[in-house]
């Protein structure tokens, strides 16, 4: 390979060096509330562990493994993993996810259940039984993170077309990935020295010595990462793998298999692996970095800085000049340096096995070279990567600030089990209180985020087709469904959606079906509406666009004595449509009834946007304070919406003789709107189990009348306990795109899990 030309092509396409596919795999041991190993089976809610693409088991039945799909950025991979962590946490009852790579409390003669498999996957269980006999169950219980990375396909295509490193895609992949691995193996000690996070084990933990076969305490030197030390996840013997070429690599592994020293490539516990996929014709597909410890300071267990640095080190390994091979002596030296970083990483004055230089001095030299080369190729033009590079330079100059050092001090101060147990409890609480998010996709509507979380639980794949429009594809190998904004699906016909969108048509169809709706008239201009003002003066009315959703453009005038307010309400409605309805206001409380496939699956009473006075702050200030609640946001990305301070709110306050500067009395509740949509700042209260069944039956009949399978139906009810009559209720609206998140995370009441019910309705 012509190195000069190779580097020239990379520099010409440096913007592609940061791109690629990124994936994470993570294991956590399930523990009881006291920190002991949970002996319950892998939760059945996750389905078949042999087939689930995201959630399975590792060595032990008590050890959950979480796997992200390949994603286009480190940030999205981190977000997906945190979401997986939340999904698992939400479905293991009172159990906790142990946040440390090293095992929790293991009693004397502790039972450590091997992961159970059946049917076509039974061989996985047999393989684990063999590992238990060879390495001991305690060692196999050590958990960690694998970071998977492949370079951009665009970059690979450009390298192929340039001819600088091969005449076929297979040759290009071989050249690129083997070059990266050779360099990464030499520098891996630096990653461990910066980001090792398993400095101490529980005092009673003993593991089988790989040399003598006898049990020994899990301790070595002034350790920083016992997981990556000789006491951690290693093979019985140190193998020499030839990384000079794909052919040499395969030959060295085949030799180990023939000599019965390993069962197959999967038993090579290497710090970094080259992975192969059939789609790439047996050539390297991606690199798996296996030396990342769990981070007890992060809920997901994945330190973002560690992953970003790993990516930078991989890119640096591509750009850094090297001779094209590693001798056995060089590989041994690299392993000794890994052992030094693992076992003596807390001593920054320790010398490396290459030269008479301290680890801190060598780390500084490498990081400065990384900064120079990565800057030269434009990799650090990205703000995130530039900050991460600066962070690592700071750590090498302030080694006591390394995360493993901080962890060591905390364990020494609090104790191994108490420290990690408290973290596990904190993270469980954080998930339970804020688990509505799909991390990394927070810019999408919350209903879509929740639907995707339900898909993860079921092991359903998904593709985001249009992020801004919340348009996704769901698939599982048997079928696929296209969904927009969580509830626009193939279950409903286009004409049914149009009927719901058009409030005039909705009313006419429901009237023909014998269902009560408000009386009123439609107008095609503000002037026509104003001409009939005397018809409505002094009577409570609702003025709304003919086609509306989410309560947009709706004004309720309960008293309607002010012609100016009537005119303003008409103007607001006409801003949203060219036809407006003026209807009789129906007394009672408004309820949102959600229907899926002719079944009522959730009912909410929505309290209009409101504030409660304290005798000091004015209404505007009280709104600002209430909007600080983290559950409130904008654009349907949180369970509740922020309260607005717009014309509609101003008009409603005026009708009450108030404005935004009015100071309410202490405990006085002031309403900002008459309509109770969550989308305009209202509060949601679950009433699914409280309303008389007659109203539910009417709601289902209404859905059938419009031939719709998914709808959010708004019904006014005077007395929820009295059976329905033609005069004590009315359906005021049927929505074709109802939000599901308000039923999943109501202000008060049960989570009705509409995201999971939507997944079932779609046939998954």
Please place each PLM-identified region on the residue numbering.
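Loop-rich catalytic cores of soluble enzymes, especially ATP-dependent carboxylate-amine ligases
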Residues: 9-11, 106, 117-137, 141, ...
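C-terminal active-site "lid" helix and adjoining low-complexity regulatory extension at the edge
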Residues: 653, 678-690, 704-708, 717-764
């Amino acid at each position: 390979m012509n190195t000069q030309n190779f580097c020239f092509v990379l520099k010409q396409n440096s913007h592609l060096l940061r791109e690629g596919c990124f994936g994470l795999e993570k294991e956590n041991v399930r523990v009881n509330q006291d920190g002991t190993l949970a002996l319950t089976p892998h939760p059945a809610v996750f389905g078949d562990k042999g087939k689930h693409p995201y959630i399975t088991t590792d060595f032990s039945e008590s050890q959950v493994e979480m796997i992200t799909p390949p994603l286009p950025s480190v940030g999205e991979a981190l977000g997906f993993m945190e979401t997986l962590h939340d999904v698992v946490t939400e479905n293991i009852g009172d159990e906790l996810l142990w946040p440390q790579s090293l095992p929790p409390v293991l009693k004397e003669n502790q039972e450590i259940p091997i992961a159970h498999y059946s049917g076509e996957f039974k061989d996985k269980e047999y393989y684990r039984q063999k590992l238990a006999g060879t390495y001991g169950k305690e060692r196999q219980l050590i958990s960690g993170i694998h970071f998977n990375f492949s370079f951009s396909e665009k970059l690979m295509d450009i390298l192929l077309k340039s001819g600088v490193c091969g005449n076929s895609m297979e040759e290009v992949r071989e050249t690129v990935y083997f070059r990266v691995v050779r360099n990464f193996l030499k520098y891996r000690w630096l990653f461990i020295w910066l980001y090792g996070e398993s400095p101490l084990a529980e005092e009673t933990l003993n593991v089988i010595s790989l040399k003598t076969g006898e049990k020994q305490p899990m301790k070595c030197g002034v350790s920083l990462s016992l997981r990556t030390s000789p006491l951690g996840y290693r093979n019985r013997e140190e193998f020499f793998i030839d990384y000079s070429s794909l052919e040499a690599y395969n030959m060295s592994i085949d030799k180990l298999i023939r000599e019965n020293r390993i069962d197959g490539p999967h038993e090579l516990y290497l710090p970094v692996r080259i992975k192969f996929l059939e789609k790439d014709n047996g050539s390297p597909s991606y690199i798996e970095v296996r030396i990342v410890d769990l981070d007890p300071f992060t809920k997901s267990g994945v330190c973002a800085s560690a992953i970003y640095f790993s990516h930078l080190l991989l890119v640096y390994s591509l750009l850094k000049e090297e001779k094209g091979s590693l001798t056995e002596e060089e590989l041994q030296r690299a392993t000794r340096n890994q052992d030094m970083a693992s076992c003596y990483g807390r001593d920054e004055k320790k010398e490396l096995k290459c030269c008479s230089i301290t680890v801190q001095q060598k780390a500084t030299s490498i990081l400065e070279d990384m900064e120079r080369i990565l800057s030269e190729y434009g990799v650090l033009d990205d703000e995130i990567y530039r900050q991460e590079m600066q962070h690592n330079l700071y750590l090498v100059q302030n080694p006591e600030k390394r995360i493993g050092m901080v962890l060591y001090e905390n364990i020494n101060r609090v104790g191994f089990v108490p420290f990690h147990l408290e973290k596990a409890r904190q993270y469980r609480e954080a998930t339970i209180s804020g688990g509505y998010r799909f991390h990394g996709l927070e810019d999408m509507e919350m209903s879509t985020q929740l639907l995707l979380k339900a898909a993860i639980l079921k092991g359903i794949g998904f593709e985001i087709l249009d992020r801004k429009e919340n348009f996704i594809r769901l698939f599982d190998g048997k079928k696929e469904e296209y969904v927009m904004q969580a509830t626009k699906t193939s279950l409903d016909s286009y004409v049914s959606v149009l009927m719901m969108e058009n409030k005039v048509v909705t009313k006419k169809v429901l009237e023909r079906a014998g269902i009560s709706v408000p009386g009123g008239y439609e107008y095609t201009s503000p002037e026509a509406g104003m001409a009939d003002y005397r018809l409505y003066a002094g009577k409570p009315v609702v003025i709304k666009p003919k086609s509306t959703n989410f309560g947009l453009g709706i004004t309720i005038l309960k008293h309607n004595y002010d012609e100016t307010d009537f005119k303003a309400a008409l103007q607001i409605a006409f801003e949203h449509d060219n036809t407006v309805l003026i209807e009789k206001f129906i007394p009672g409380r408004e309820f949102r009834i959600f229907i899926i496939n002719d079944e009522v699956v959730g009912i909410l009473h929505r309290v209009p946007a409101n504030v409660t006075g304290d005798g000091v702050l004015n209404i505007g200030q009280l709104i600002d304070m209430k909007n600080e609640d983290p559950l409130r946001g904008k654009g349907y990305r949180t369970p509740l919406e922020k309260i607005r301070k717009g014309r509609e709110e101003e008009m409603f306050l005026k009708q009450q003789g108030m404005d935004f500067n009015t100071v309410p009395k202490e405990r006085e509740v002031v309403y900002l709107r008459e309509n109770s949509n969550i989308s305009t700042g209202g509060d949601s209260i679950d009433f699914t189990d409280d309303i008389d069944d007659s109203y539910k039956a009417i709601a289902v009949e209404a859905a059938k009348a419009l031939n719709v399978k998914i709808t959010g139906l708004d019904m006014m009810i005077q007395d929820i306990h009295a059976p329905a009559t033609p005069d004590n209720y009315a359906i005021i609206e049927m929505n074709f795109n109802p939000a599901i998140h308000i039923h999943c995370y109501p202000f008060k009441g049960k989570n009705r899990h509409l995201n999971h019910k939507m997944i079932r309705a779609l046939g998954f």
